[in-house]
Amino acid sequence: MRQLSLCILSLFLLQGCFLRENPIKASMKNDDFLLEILKNKDEYEIQIAYTEITRDKEGKPVFREFEFQVDEEIYFYPASTIKLPIIVLTLDKINDLRSTGIDITPKSKIIVSSTHDENNQIQKDSITSFQNLIADVFLVSDNTASNILIDFIGHNYFNTKMVQAGFKHTYLNHKFNPDPYVNINWKIKTLKNELISSNENQITITADQKTLRLKKGKNRFQNGEVVPGAFDFSRKNRSSITDMQNILKRIIFPLEFDKDKTFNLNVEDYDFLRYWMSRFTYEDIGDKFKTEKKYFDSYNKFFIHGEDTIVRDKNIRVYNKIGQAYGTSIDNAYIKNYQDGVEFFLTATIYTNKNKTINDNVYEYNQIAIPFLSKLSQSIYSRLSE
């Protein structure tokens, strides 16, 4: 009889687990705008990964993972979100170089020069640091800084390291536009004139051709006019929602993962990453961006803040990297309120391209994409705060 009672109790508890609604879907039902997106989830190519975080008695994080329409084989353009692993591997390579005897840190001064002719003299022999380049990427997603970092690590280094760490859906095939210097191969040297960049003779590795939906749209804007035919993304950069969030988890909680599935980073590197990821645009050296009208304090945060240009509560920190291009908008973030202890991971992408034309810069970002990402994160945050 006792065994029967235990069996019935187990079945009841198991049924309760199955009956619990996916919190992602539940959060979208609480808002009319989100509900409308939910009804058209396939049109908007939504993919969402959400991880609840609780703490055990020792304060260690306990993850509970949820997904909505996540499919690693369905392509979406990662845009600037792929800059996060570029930065991670920049720090990784700095440590590799230091192990060979080169005296270098993220704060070290470096010489960045162009391999082109005198017409680009303005870019020759400029002195900066990896810290400044990385800060500019996190604060305003600077493309030139990102492309310099790509030439520092090299495509092969990036793609090989991603596979070694278990991220098999993340590939780097090209640099970022718009950038007036996108075709320049940058040479990076130490102040001792040691060449440390890896930009020459790089072989790019294209995304697995088994990937689905590599062609998007019905038309494309080309040479000043709309021409028929889908845009082919087969040679573009590639990532997945799962890879993005798992990379971020290793940055926020590196001790929760096996060393062979993390990166060659030290404690200072992780602190450095977390600091700059969580900055609002005008914080620290970001004060220099106040003179440019297109920027605002929450410019680099789709989640929680959206188009609200004023940061209203700095107790809520968003450790993230956003991306937006070709109709795709993405945010990949660890969100934490240091006052009430609410914390979670959220990674989401949405595709908005009503006229089905690629490259015409008419993508409903402000009308649909950014409001979706901000409202989704706010709804999930509210549920956790109850």
Predicted features along the sequence, with ranges:
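Bacterial Sec-dependent N-terminal signal peptides
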Residues: 1-24
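Short, glycine/proline-biased beta-turn/loop segments that scaffold the active-site neighborhood
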Residues: 96-127
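Residue-level preference for non-acidic, small/hydrophobic
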Residues: 83-90, 137, 162, 244, ...
